[in-house]
Amino acid sequence: MTEFESAPAYQEAKYLTSAAEFDQLPPDQGAEIAFIGRSNAGKSSALNIITGIKGLARTSKTPGRTQMINFFALNEHERLVDLPGYGYAKVPRMVQKRWEELVDSYLKNRRCLKGLVVVMDIRHPLKEMDEDVIEWAVNYDIPIHILLTKSDKLSQNAAKKTLGEVQTAISAYGEKLTLQLFSSHDRTGLDEVKAVLSQWFRSEP
């Protein structure tokens, strides 16, 4: 068995580097899975729970604060990537445009990118910018997995109802998009998302 055939040790994640510009990205080799979502949708909390490392990805009380791409190494060849959050109304238009250019360049040109996890608060799914990000990734032929986070905030029936509604809304994209319920609070869906990530890491280039 080679190093690429075994499941990644997510608990071994370590901060690698941050990039504010496309030319600051680490070498485009190995395999990466990126996480993206609206500010305060629970993206950083999801990364912390998946790796089991509290504080790995910084959570912020100020939406839109993080405007850099953060890389976390699982091993020499595999990385998790925390893309900057979006959708905060108080961010100046110039900052928003810079975010769009940086993220679009990353999604379009990053050859080692295996998949994109789109994080959405289950109480506010599929906002306009969520749909824009999905369109970008679909156009660049990037597999997408949606995490409907904070599922513990809804009753079980309400969460399942929202899951079904989002599934219907994205059905036109076909098998390129998958989704699940997730909660960093009670760990709902943790094994499921880890299985998706591991499958992506094991996929052929």
Curated annotation (Swiss-Prot):
One Pfam family matching this protein: MMR_HSR1
Keywords: Cell cycle, Cell division, GTP-binding, Magnesium, Metal-binding, Nucleotide-binding, Septation
Coiled coil: none
Record-annotated EngB-type G domain positions: 29-203
Cofactor(s) essential for the protein: Mg(2+)
GO molecular function, one term: metal ion binding
Positions contributing to GTP binding: 37-44, 64-68, 82-85, 149-152, 182-184
BP GO annotations: division septum assembly
InterPro entries named in the record: G_ENGB_dom, GTP-bd, GTP-bd_ribosome_bio_YsxC, P-loop_NTPase
Signal peptide: none
CC per GO annotation: cytosol
Positions contributing to Mg(2+) binding: 44, 66
Top-level taxonomic group: Bacteria
Similarity comment text for this entry: Belongs to the TRAFAC class TrmE-Era-EngA-EngB-Septin-like GTPase superfamily. EngB GTPase family.
Function: Necessary for normal cell division and for the maintenance of normal septation.
Protein name: Probable GTP-binding protein EngB
